[in-house]
C-alpha cells in the first residue's frame, strides 16, 4: 500500500495500467473461488507487490469453471497520490468471462471509457483499445498468476472499462493522437510519481510518431498553447495531428522526429524558449538553465543595436527585455530573425543533415514577428 503519512506533495500513486491489472486479477480470483475478494495483491511491472482495495466485486452465471461462475466483475479506484492527474479517482473496471473456444488464451478488450486507436504510429493496432504494451503484459501476467487452473481448460476474456473515461479524456492529448472515446491505459512501472514529467514526455514522443504517419513528412513543434495557435494559423494546410506541443522537451521531440524519418521540422516559439534552444539547451524548463543574455546582446549588435542597448540587454536577466528594447529601436523583426537563424544553426550542428528546419517566432500576443529557414 502507499504510505499515507508521506510528506505532502510526495505521496506516490498508481497508474491506470496497475489498477486495471489489479481489477482483472481480483475478477479472475472470483472465477476461481466463487467470490471476488475485497482486496487483492497485484504484481506491478516494476516487480513490486501491492495490495489494492477492490469494490463492486461479483461473480455471475452458473456452470462455469472451478468457482462455478461464467463471468466476474471487479473495480479498483485509481489513487494518483499527490500527482495532479486528470485520471485520479477513475474507476478501473475489469469484466472477465470464460471462453471455452480458446483454452489457455488471455484476450484483452477495451470497454466503455477506454479509447480506441484510430491512427498508426503508437505501436498499437488501429481499431483496438488504447491499452499500452506494458499494461497489456502486466494484466495478462496477473491473470495467469491466479487463473492457471482455469486456463488449463478454458480461455479468459478480460474487458477493461472506465465509466468516467469519456469525460476524462477531454483533459488529455488523446484526441490529438487519434485515440477517441476514452482514456489510455498507461504505465511502464505501475507507479505514479508526483509532478513527474514522464507522462508528458511520452505524449510528446507519441505525438511526433503520429505526425510521422500522416504522409506530410513534417511535424510542427511548439512550446505551448499560444505558439501552437499561432503556427496553426500560419500553416492551415496541415492537419491538427501534425502539431505537437513539446513544452520544454525539445530533446525528446527531436529524437522522435529523427526516428520517424520526418523530412521537415518546424519550431514555433517566443523569444525566451527560442533563446534557450539557440544557446544549445534541449530541455528548456526555467529551472534547468538561465537565458544567455550575452548571446542576445551579440544578436542585437549584429543587427545594428548601439553599444549601450547591447550592454543593457547583457545586464538584464530576461529574453523578453531584449525583445522589447529591440522593438523600441525599430529593430525587432531583424533581431528576432537573427535569433531564429541562430536556432537553426544550433540545431543543424546537433542534428546534421537529418531534416529541413524552419523557425517561426511570435510575440506574447501570438502575432508573427519573424521566421527563418
Curated annotation (Swiss-Prot):
Keywords assigned by UniProt, alphabetized: Cobalamin biosynthesis, Methyltransferase, S-adenosyl-L-methionine, Transferase
Keyword Cell membrane: no
Pathway given in the UniProt record: Cofactor biosynthesis; adenosylcobalamin biosynthesis; cob(II)yrinate a,c-diamide from sirohydrochlorin (anaerobic route): step 6/10
GO MF, one example: cobalt-precorrin-5B C1-methyltransferase activity
The protein's Enzyme Commission number: 2.1.1.195
Pfam families xrefs: CbiD
Coiled coil feature spans: none
Family assignment from sequence similarity: Belongs to the CbiD family.
Name this protein carries in UniProt: Cobalt-precorrin-5B C(1)-methyltransferase
Native organism: Polaromonas sp. (strain JS666 / ATCC BAA-500)
Amino acid at each position: 500500500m502507499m504510505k499515507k503519512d508521506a510528506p505532502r506533495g510526495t505521496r506516490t500513486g498508481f497508474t491506470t495500467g496497475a489498477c486495471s491489472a489489479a481489477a482483472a486479477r481480483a475478477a479472475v480470483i472470483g472465477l476461481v473461488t466463487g467470490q471476488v475478494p475485497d482486496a487483492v495483491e497485484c504484481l506491478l511491472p516494476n516487480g513490486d507487490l501491492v495490495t489494492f482495495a477492490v469494490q463492486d466485486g461479483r461473480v455471475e452465471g452458473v456452470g462455469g469453471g472451478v468457482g462455478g461462475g461464467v463471468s466476474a466483475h471487479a473495480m479498483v479506484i485509481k489513487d494518483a497520490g499527490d500527482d495532479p492527474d486528470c485520471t485520479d479517482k477513475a474507476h478501473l473496471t475489469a469484466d472477465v468471462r470464460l471462453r471455452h473456444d480458446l483454452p489457455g488464451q488471455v484476450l484483452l478488450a477495451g470497454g466503455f471509457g477506454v479509447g480506441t486507436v484510430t491512427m498508426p504510429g503508437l505501436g498499437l493496432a488501429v481499431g483496438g483499445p488504447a491499452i499500452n504494451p506494458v499494461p497489456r503484459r502486466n494484466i495478462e501476467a496477473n491473470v495467469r498468476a491466479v487463473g492457471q487452473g482455469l486456463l488449463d481448460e478454458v480461455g479468459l476474456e478480460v474487458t477493461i472499462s472506465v465509466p468516467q473515461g469519456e469525460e476524462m479524456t477531454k483533459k488529455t492529448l488523446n484526441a490529438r493522437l487519434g485515440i477517441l472515446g476514452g482514456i489510455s491505459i498507461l504505465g511502464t512501472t505501475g507507479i505514479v510519481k508526483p509532478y513527474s514529467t514522464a507522462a508528458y514526455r511520452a505524449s510528446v514522443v507519441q505525438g511526433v510518431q503520429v505526425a510521422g504517419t500522416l504522409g506530410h513528412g513534417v511535424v510542427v513543434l511548439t512550446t505551448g498553447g499560444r505558439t501552437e495557435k499561432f503556427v496553426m494559423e500560419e500553416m492551415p494546410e496541415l492537419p491538427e495531428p501534425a502539431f505537437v506541443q513539446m513544452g520544454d522537451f525539445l530533446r525528446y521531440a527531436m529524437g522522435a522526429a529523427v526516428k520517424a524519418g520526418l523530412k521537415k521540422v518546424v519550431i514555433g516559439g517566443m523569444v525566451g524558449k527560442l533563446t534557450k534552444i539557440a544557446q544549445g539547451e534541449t530541455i528548456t524548463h526555467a529551472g534547468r538553465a538561465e537565458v544567455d543574455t550575452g548571446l542576445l546582446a551579440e544578436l542585437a549588435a549584429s543587427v545594428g543595436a548601439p553599444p549601450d542597448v547591447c550592454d543593457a540587454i547583457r545586464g538584464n536577466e530576461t529574453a523578453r527585455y531584449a525583445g522589447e528594447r529591440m522593438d523600441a529601436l525599430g529593430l525587432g523583426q531583424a533581431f528576432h530573425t537573427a535569433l531564429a537563424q541562430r536556432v537553426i544553426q544550433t540545431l543543424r550542428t546537433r542534428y546534421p543533415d537529418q531534416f529541413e528546419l524552419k523557425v517561426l517566432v511570435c510575440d506574447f500576443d501570438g502575432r508573427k514577428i519573424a521566421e527563418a529557414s
